[in-house]
């Protein structure tokens, strides 16, 4: 399945914008976002990527799992405290596991582009109702009547093998 997002500048003047595509997931699952490859301190002293926090994000919230390979956020219908992070996701994918099903969303990353929200091309949000996997395209200036087209490949849900 493929979803195509199109934005058209209907103004009489140019605008700067970034496409922002939300995949709204059912309650009760968890989002899985890949970490950048781990490298020992002796091999790499430079930062790997930005981690952007919103003012209501609580990194001690038990719905978060901060692992070596993945960052995970669990959706809990009994917890009404919203959580959100943004990352520069160079692998270009995020997944949602609900029971035995795994939904994978893929999106591009352009290392030469500027991204909104301190350089994020991927954000995840949850509250007591849903979890969102958000993909952001690069910031760009669009002339009147110009169309921005961003394709997002969505892989058919499949059986998962418990990502850890």
Positions of predicted regions on the chain:
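A contiguous, surface-exposed recognition patch within enzymatic or periplasmic domains that forms
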Residues: 10-18, 22-147
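Asparagine-centered strand-capping/turn motif at beta-strand->loop junctions
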Residues: 5-11, 156
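Hydrophobic core residues within well-ordered beta-strands of beta-rich domains
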Residues: 1-3, 148
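Short amphipathic alpha-helical leader/targeting segments
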Residues: 19, 159-160
């Amino acid at each position: 399945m493929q979803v195509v997002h199109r934005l058209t500048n209907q103004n009489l003047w140019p605008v700067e914008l970034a496409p922002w595509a939300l995949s709204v997931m059912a309650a009760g699952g968890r989002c899985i976002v890949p970490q950048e490859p781990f490298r020992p301190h002796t091999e790499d002293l430079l930062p790997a990527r930005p981690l952007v926090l919103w003012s209501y994000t609580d990194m001690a919230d038990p719905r978060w799992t901060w692992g070596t390979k993945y960052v995970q956020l669990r959706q809990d219908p009994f917890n009404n405290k919203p959580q959100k992070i943004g990352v520069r996701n160079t692998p270009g994918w995020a997944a949602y596991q609900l029971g035995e099903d795994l939904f994978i969303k893929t999106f591009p990353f352009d290392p030469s582009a500027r991204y909104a929200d301190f350089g994020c091309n991927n954000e995840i949000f949850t509250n007591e109702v849903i979890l969102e996997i958000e993909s952001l395209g690069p910031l760009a200036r669009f002339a009147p009547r110009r169309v921005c087209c961003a394709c997002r490949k969505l892989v058919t849900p499949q059986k998962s093998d418990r990502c850890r």
